[in-house]
Amino acid sequence: MAVLASGLTACTGRHSNTDVPAEVTMSKEVLLDKIKGGWAGQTIGCTYGGPTEFNYRGIMIADSIPINWPDHYIKHYYENNPWLYDDIYMDLTFVDIFDRLGLDAPVDSFALAFANAEYSLWHGNQAARYNILYKGIMPPESGHWRNSPHADDIDFQIEADFAGLMSPGMPQTASEISDKIGHILAYGDGWYGGVYVANMYALAF
């Protein structure tokens, strides 16, 4: 125990709270570059995982499996497998509502926007769409486990990026956005995973 305690003391000594600046400043140009980088990273990540999605369920992908990245790969997937980017088009739907209706847009406006969109959805997203359009169950009940067998799926986790990108250095704001929108389609672990991702983005600035 003494060794463990001394080890923890050493670790916390090297990474104390004094290492975290009380204030971070950056130019608008740097901020914009970081936000663009976040969107680019999400798009690249969707594409990179495309060839292996659902092929290695329950096991790790072996190091011997090549992950190819030919030229124009993103363009190819966007044109031939657009469903792969549900992470992106769900995010953009929510951002569009913020852009048109403001930061205090009512939660029903987000719910109806994606529920009536023509793009394909799966699992938690699809269950929420069904609840909203066909059962008249609006958020937050649309994502509650009593109404959705997919409430704890990863749908919100893979779509929460926008909440962090819109809240640079403001994890509390990212959590508030997540509380409103995440419960449209998720509950419990399905929601907590999204809040975690949104906060990582917010703190990355």
Model-derived regions, located:
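Structured, active/binding-site neighborhoods that engage oxygen-rich ligands
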Residues: G13-F205
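C-terminal motif of bacterial Sec signal peptides marking the signal peptidase cleavage site
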Residues: G7-A10
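Sec-dependent N-terminal signal peptides
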Residues: M1-A5
